[in-house]
């Protein structure tokens, strides 16, 4: 008699799945955490909603209205979810038939697009970016048959650069009537002029992912948004959980999106950008650093001599960076979150001490 294990009962694609290696999952025992693109200090909030015996609204009205006003869209073009990661998954669940349809993304980029698709049983197609990390439009065009959702991160994580807006327009024309194009704007607060939110009227198949985890300094809240036309939002509403946001999360999100919350966010952004420029200038003078890439975000990608040794050396000193060596075209690269001046100085001093 054959014994069937619990693992044997699991779906084959789940058995074969490599889970996303989040910064927290990778661990480390540090006191300088520069591996998850978080804001370096906590912002304080007071809970005002105490009725925790009642279920929350599925889409909290104040949160939706505040975010719509902030993003310059209509409330019916906004969906709030448990982080932008849930938005990534909802789009696949709403638009992709497992075993039939595919998603497409352009590495090196954020790892959750593939993990979400693989979990659901949807094929992943990749078209690596060009040498300048811009879209390979011909390559995308050649692979579009059967693709229902295309993910483009701009500014891109982990490289830090914006995608050329004309290339976005070409992609949106290529996919019209065929696929949803998802612009992942998790870091758009650091370069707000580049948002595609104003394009929604022109492109019914455009969706935009946003988050409160970065510039709003609320990574622990798990609150994200999808901006899209009402037809797309209505489809996502069919597959989202009935109560995606807890009452305390909605309460804090509404406060963060108040006029004074937006002002505070913009002050944080200005501070991070100033610190980013300081850190870039310092990195460019350090012998073990081969190249520092331009960034429109709250992190810096740099190529190092002996990057694995540098990564481990800093790790052992309690400075936790993000190793990007395994990503296509990123050999020797580490990603450094922009933190406080004190944290920047710890990184600079540690790197200066590295023997080349």
Swiss-Prot record:
CDD domains in alphabetical order: AAT_like (cd00609)
InterPro entries: Aminotrans_II_pyridoxalP_BS (IPR001917), Aminotransferase_I/II_large (IPR004839), HisP_aminotrans (IPR005861), PyrdxlP-dep_Trfase (IPR015424), PyrdxlP-dep_Trfase_major (IPR015421), PyrdxlP-dep_Trfase_small (IPR015422)
Cofactor: pyridoxal 5'-phosphate
Pathway assigned to this chain's UniProt record: Amino-acid biosynthesis; L-histidine biosynthesis; L-histidine from 5-phospho-alpha-D-ribose 1-diphosphate: step 7/9
Entry EC number(s): 2.6.1.9
Catalytic activity, as annotated: L-histidinol phosphate + 2-oxoglutarate = 3-(imidazol-4-yl)-2-oxopropyl phosphate + L-glutamate
Molecular function terms, GO-annotated: histidinol-phosphate transaminase activity; pyridoxal phosphate binding
Stored Gene3D superfamilies: Aspartate Aminotransferase, domain 1 (3.90.1150.10), Type I PLP-dependent aspartate aminotransferase-like (Major domain) (3.40.640.10)
Keyword hit for Transferase: yes
Matches recorded under SUPFAM superfamilies: PLP-dependent transferases
DNA-binding recorded as keyword: no
Pfam families linked to this entry: Aminotran_1_2 (PF00155)
GO biological process: L-histidine biosynthetic process
Modified positions (N6-(pyridoxal phosphate)lysine) in chain numbering: 214
Superkingdom: Bacteria
Keywords: Amino-acid biosynthesis, Aminotransferase, Histidine biosynthesis, Pyridoxal phosphate, Transferase
EC category name: transferase
Subunit and partners: Homodimer.
Family: Belongs to the class-II pyridoxal-phosphate-dependent aminotransferase family. Histidinol-phosphate aminotransferase subfamily.
Record-linked HAMAP family: HisC_aminotrans_2 (MF_01023)
Protein name as catalogued: Histidinol-phosphate aminotransferase
Source organism (scientific name): Escherichia coli O127:H6 (strain E2348/69 / EPEC)
